[in-house]
Amino acid sequence: MKIRASVRKICDKCRLIRRRGRIIVICSNPRHKQRQG
């Protein structure tokens, strides 16, 4: 899980989700997991 100021999709399978007011990227590739800090 990377915490970043700006999250973006890295590949086609990345999905942007809003959870508890935070933007999260989930993907089948675990390296692409991100959260907005």
From Swiss-Prot:
Q: Which GO terms describe its biological process?
A: translation
Transit peptide as UniProt keyword: no
Subcellular localization, per the record? Plastid, Chloroplast
Record-level Gene Ontology MF annotations: structural constituent of ribosome
Which keywords appear in this protein's UniProt record, sorted alphabetically? Answer: Chloroplast, Plastid, Ribonucleoprotein, Ribosomal protein
Q: Which Cys pairs are S-S linked?
A: none
A GO CC term? Answer: ribonucleoprotein complex
Q: Which family does it belong to?
A: Belongs to the bacterial ribosomal protein bL36 family.
HAMAP family found in the cross-reference section: Ribosomal_bL36
Name recorded for this polypeptide: Large ribosomal subunit protein bL36c
In its UniProt entry, the species of origin is given as Coffea arabica
